[in-house]
């Protein structure tokens, strides 16, 4: 393992966060705070409770997951796309560093930034609603799994994209709708049986459900299923990344 090379990629990507602090940290925190104000205070005051929890408190895990998902994809996709765009990726591919180490550096940095952002948003949520985490270790487990999984997914998008439009297309047209329809603002159990069955095909449901369970011990699906689905998606992303480097897809042209 070439730790110096991995560390160089990791430090470069982390340094980019400080250069774009408003976009990377401040903007997501402010946007999520507006959700708390609108949905938690304005609308939440008119909703008694959801699954025995006040509405403002209920939406906290979903909003944290919303930010972690979107930022994981954005950080990882732009991180690998920019070297492709300027042509420096050829220097990276010809350097004495394995493909695994390249992925580890980029994905590790993207996941770290998303985890830190998630914790900041969680602390911000405590200013608006009372929070109590019943299972902190499970909370961290789901947070890390989600950040790593969707950073890998973002890495795949960054390699696949051949323009800035495509770089934004998957997050805007696929990931954001899946997140909003994944139980961020409501319990899946509130839906009619037909819609509930369709909703359970959404992988984001299992992430949010497991993450919410770590807070309030309430979930739309069992924790075991949530972990299994998340790990399955993680393995699928790892297989796709392996295939990309094995075939050179969108890397050598």
Report the location of each language-model feature.
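Hydrophobic transmembrane alpha-helices and immediately adjacent juxtamembrane helices
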Residues: 1-137, 141-253
């Amino acid at each position: 393992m070439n730790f110096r090379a991995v560390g160089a990629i990791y430090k470069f990507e982390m340094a980019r966060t400080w250069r774009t602090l408003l976009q990377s940290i401040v903007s997501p925190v402010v946007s999520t705070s507006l959700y708390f104000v609108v949905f938690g205070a304005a609308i939440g005051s008119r909703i008694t409770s959801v699954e025995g929890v006040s509405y403002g408190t209920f939406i906290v895990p979903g909003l944290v997951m919303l930010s972690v998902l979107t930022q994981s994809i954005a950080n990882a996709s732009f991180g690998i796309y920019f070297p492709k765009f300027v042509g420096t990726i050829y220097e990276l591919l010809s350097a004495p560093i394995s493909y695994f180490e390249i992925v580890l550096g980029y994905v590790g940095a993207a996941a770290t930034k998303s985890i830190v952002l998630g914790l900041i948003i969680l602390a911000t949520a405590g200013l608006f609603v009372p929070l109590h985490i019943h299972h902190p270790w499970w909370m961290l487990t789901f947070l890390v799994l989600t950040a790593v999984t969707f950073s890998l997914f973002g890495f795949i998008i960054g390699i696949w994209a051949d323009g800035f439009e495509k770089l934004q297309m998957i997050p805007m047209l696929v990931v954001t709708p899946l997140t909003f329809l994944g139980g961020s603002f409501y319990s899946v159990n509130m839906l009619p049986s037909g819609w509930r069955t369709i909703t359970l095909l959404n992988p984001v449901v299992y992430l949010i459900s497991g993450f919410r369970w770590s807070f309030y011990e309430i979930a739309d699906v069992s924790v075991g299923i949530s972990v299994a689905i998340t790990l399955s998606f993680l393995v699928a992303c790892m297989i796709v990344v392996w295939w990309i480097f094995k075939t050179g897809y969108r890397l050598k042209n």
